[in-house]
Structure formats: structure tokens, C-alpha cells
Amino acid sequence: MESADFYEAEPRPPMSSHLQSPPHAPSSAAFGFPRGAGPAQPPAPPAAPEPLGGICEHETSIDISAYIDPAAFNDEFLADLFQHSRQQEKAKAAVGPTGGGGGGDFDYPGAPAGPGGAVMPGGAHGPPPGYGCAAAGYLDGRLEPLYERVGAPALRPLVIKQEPREEDEAKQLALAGLFPYQPPPPPPPSHPHPHPPPAHLAAPHLQFQIAHCGQTTMHLQPGHPTPPPTPVPSPHPAPALGAAGLPGPGSALKGLGAAHPDLRASGGSGAGKAKKSVDKNSNEYRVRRERNNIAVRKSRDKAKQRNVETQQKVLELTSDNDRLRKRVEQLSRELDTLRGIFRQLPESSLVKAMGNCA
């Protein structure tokens, strides 16, 4: 594809080729100006295009900024590299230093020196006025969108990992020690508790479970004055529950109460109030208490019956032992008598008796 089909002037060489061209060769053809033309000379007819080079000769001069995703420029080294190349392009595009024939790529021999020794465009062999502005604008227009997409490395959003606080870790450890896996599901419909606590007290699921566990352990202990094995519970268990903070002597519950003072205060008071209301106004609690009492009485009756049976067996075995001892004593006496009789008999009679037996 030849560029002469689209431009009336000579084809524009790549940016890298005209930036690295020797000082004596003017590069105004890159912007469409014919070579050797001055402001007073008429424009020359379009010259024949220069022969193109190899296929991959100017491969590095292709502008691929429009095809590169801006999200790919996330490396600070790449951004610094583009920033450095941009500064070099701007420095080359600017007017060269003092000297009138400088050595820069955009210096033109024979151009008049302006104030401060700067070479002014529009000399005998230079481009028309405004060339420096056009070149600077061209380079800025070609390079600015790329750096606008890249952005400053210091302004990029940084993803900062937040470390958990010590309080959160302590809470998680305490909960993990209590319940190995305790998801927060909604309360089941068929709950054994007849009257759940109010809405402001039933919000924390853990408080509800702790109160229910404490109530269950207290319900399993009857308060009737029956023989020794089970202790009688206190008539007012709610104040003890509030003072202790959490029911149960376990170290995990104590650690949880120490880690959550607000939970300890609210849970103790709420559970005590709920239990008082249940003890006074719940028929289901009374029925359950009666069933527990009946079961305890049955178990105690069975224990008493086993004790009586054991005592009877002990008495029977004792009597048998006495009878056997008496039998042993009787047989011992008979043996001693027989031994005495045999000792009193003479030896001759014994020999005769043995001969008769033989």
C-alpha cells in the first residue's frame, strides 16, 4: 500500500526515522512541505514518491496506542518509560539552543537567530512560519491521549488489605470454642420454649441459645424433698444467672462472657425476665415439670426396688454361708471323732481288718 495514493506531497517517513536523521538533511517532507521550498518560492509540483523500503523496515514506528487497552498500563516501570520518551519527543520538537545552526533534528541552516540566540523558523531553507508550533502540536496530539490513559502512577487506586482487629479475633475464637459450626438460621417454628422473649431480647441468636440451655439444665433438677441423690435447686435462680452472667461452669462460657460484657448484661437480665414469666404463666411449663417429676419418682422407685432386691440377696447369701459353715464344722467334728477311734484300736486289729478288706 503506497501512501502516494492518498497524499499529494511526498510520503511522510516514520517518527523514529526523521527524529534520527542527520542534521544536514531537512525533514520537512514529513509534514507535507516540499524540500528546498522557501516562503517566497512557489510550491513545487508533487514529486514522485520515494521507493519504499523492506516489508519490516519501519515496524517499530507503528502507532499502536489506539489498540492498547488502558487497563494494561498498570506497571510503574512502563509508565515511567512512556513519560521519559514523551519528554525526549518534546525536547526534540522544541526549538534548538543557541548557535544558529545547532545540531538538533528541527534546526535549519541559515535560519535567522531570534532574541536570546534561538533560531527562528522561516529562513532560506526552513519551513514557513508556524512550523515549530505545528510540530509541537502534532507531537502532543499524537502522544497526549496515550499518557492521559496511562495516568500518573501515584494517582492509581491501591488495594489495601485490611487486617482483622484483635477484638474480632477474640470473638471468633470464643464462638468457635462454643459452637463448632453455628450458622445463624431463623428460629424454628416448633420451638420447645412456650413464650419466647420479646423482639428486642430475642434478636441475638446466641443469647437465646444460652438462656434456653440454662433453663433446660435447671428444669431437669426437681425440687421435691425426696431421698438424697439430686440437690434441690434454689427458689430464685434468675438473680444467680444475672450475677454469673452466663449459665454453666464451663471455661468457654466464662471466656465468652468476659469477651462480651454487653452480651453478659443483656443476656442475663433478658433470660431472667423470660424465665420468671414462664414459671408464673405457662401451662406447658407446668405439664413438663409434672412429667419430669413423675419420671424422677419412677426412677427413684426403681432404685429403691433394686436396693431392696440387693439386700434380700445379701441376706440369702449370708444365711447360706452360715449354713455351710455349720456343715463344715459338723464334718470337722465327725472327722476328729473317727480319727480318735482309729487311734484307740490296736495295730493287730487294724491288720486283720485290712486283710479282711483285701
UniProtKB/Swiss-Prot annotation:
Specify the effect of I64A: Decreased interaction with TRIB1
- Region listing for Required to repress E2F1:TFDP1-mediated transcription, to inhibit cell cycle and to induce adipocyte differentiation, in residue ranges: 1-70
Q: What is the effect of changing H58D?
A: No effect on interaction with TRIB1
Matching entries from Gene3D superfamilies are given as: 1.20.5.170
**Region listing for Leucine-zipper, in residue ranges:** 317-345
The record's GO molecular-function terms, alphabetically, read: chromatin DNA binding; DNA binding; DNA-binding transcription activator activity, RNA polymerase II-specific; DNA-binding transcription factor activity; DNA-binding transcription factor activity, RNA polymerase II-specific; histone deacetylase binding; HMG box domain binding; identical protein binding
Where is this chain compositionally biased, Pro residues type? 40-49, 181-199, 224-238
* PTM-bearing positions, type N6-acetyllysine: K161
Record key words, sorted: Acetylation, Activator, Developmental protein, Disease variant, DNA-binding, Host-virus interaction, Isopeptide bond, Nucleus, Phosphoprotein, Transcription, Transcription regulation, Ubl conjugation
Q: Where does the record put the Glycyl lysine isopeptide (Lys-Gly) (interchain with G-Cter in SUMO2) cross-link?
A: K161
Extract the ranges annotated as region (Interaction with FOXO1): 244-358
Q: Which stretches does the entry tag as region Required to functionally cooperate with SREBF1 in promoter activation?
A: 182-198
Asked if the record carries the keyword Heme, the reply is no
In the record, Phosphothreonine modifications are located at T226, T230
Give a short account of what the protein does. Transcription factor that coordinates proliferation arrest and the differentiation of myeloid progenitors, adipocytes, hepatocytes, and cells of the lung and the placenta. Binds directly to the consensus DNA sequence 5'-T[TG]NNGNAA[TG]-3' acting as an activator on distinct target genes. During early embryogenesis, plays essential and redundant functions with CEBPB. Essential for the transition from common myeloid progenitors (CMP) to granulocyte/monocyte progenitors (GMP). Critical for the proper development of the liver and the lung.
**In which family does this protein belong, per the annotation?**
Belongs to the bZIP family. C/EBP subfamily.
Quaternary structure annotation from Swiss-Prot or TrEMBL: Binds DNA as a homodimer and as a heterodimer. Can form stable heterodimers with CEBPB, CEBPD, CEBPE and CEBPG. Interacts with PRDM16. Interacts with UBN1. Interacts with ZNF638; this interaction increases transcriptional activation. Interacts with the complex TFDP2:E2F1; the interaction prevents CEBPA binding to target gene promoters and represses its transcriptional activity. Interacts with RB1. Interacts (when phosphorylated at Ser-190) with CDK2, CDK4, E2F4 and SMARCA2. Interacts with SREBPF1.
> Which PANTHER family does this entry report, sorted A to Z?
CCAAT/ENHANCER BINDING PROTEIN, CCAAT_ENHANCER-BINDING PROTEIN ALPHA
**Descriptive protein name:** CCAAT/enhancer-binding protein alpha
Its taxonomic placement starts with:
Eukaryota, Metazoa, Chordata, Craniata, Vertebrata
What is the gene name?
CEBPA
